[in-house]
């Protein structure tokens, strides 16, 4: 049967397409908006059956043009948290998602979609409960509002609906994201260009570089998506993070040491990297004060209860793999 991946030329979508290929799945309809043409590179080493622009896709899917569709991996969205055009964001992330959901429900198609930890905003608890959800930007609100629709629909849905609140995802195929690419990606490029990585200094009680996030490898994100794809009886909204909060220092230090290893140099401790000027701390910008999350950490209780028991890569493991991959692309 046919599979559909929206946002297929994007970061997570392309990784899902590649992972499906590795399982022998090639009857895939890739849906995206290639106005930003450089995203095509993410699909060059992938096998797909057809490509459709997102505007054409919604109408044809609703019309039943693709026959029996087993599953839709709905990764297509505007993920720029700095976007201020609310009308664009709501149309692209909310209305579009509702249209795809409605057709999946009507046709009995598995619906696996990208939500976001941005829904939690400035909360200090990261559990899938309404009372801790307080998005700080229109991107987070667009994801929040769609999750509320899902909560209303789930009790009567006859087919799978699985939403994943992605935390800070990093890994291959994110180059096109520019300023919205991961910290690991930017640290890698900064070190190659300047010979050092710059991190924020002390802020809000956190020592320099010790602000923490739940950094999750796209490898793990893909594995979780495929686990639920294999278990259509499991529905719900789930946090998708490692369950560990690790400091930005860990990202930077791993980037530096992996690049040193590739250059046949020995690893250094964080203190040694700072002492040698390989990591530099800059004053925390005034523009971000009061708007910056110093801590995120996924509560994995629901995910584990659903039966997903595989370990998640640590920053040291995942960023090391990613830097080696990036180095091979240069």
From Swiss-Prot:
Reactions mediated catalytically: ADP-D-glycero-beta-D-manno-heptose = ADP-L-glycero-beta-D-manno-heptose
Keyword set includes Isomerase: yes
Molecular function per GO: ADP-glyceromanno-heptose 6-epimerase activity; NADP binding
Binding site for substrate: 168, 179, 186, 200-203, 213, 292
Free-text domain note: Contains a large N-terminal NADP-binding domain, and a smaller C-terminal substrate-binding domain.
Subunit structure: Homopentamer.
Protein's name in the database: ADP-L-glycero-D-manno-heptose-6-epimerase
Organism from which the protein derives: Burkholderia lata (strain ATCC 17760 / DSM 23089 / LMG 22485 / NCIMB 9086 / R18194 / 383)
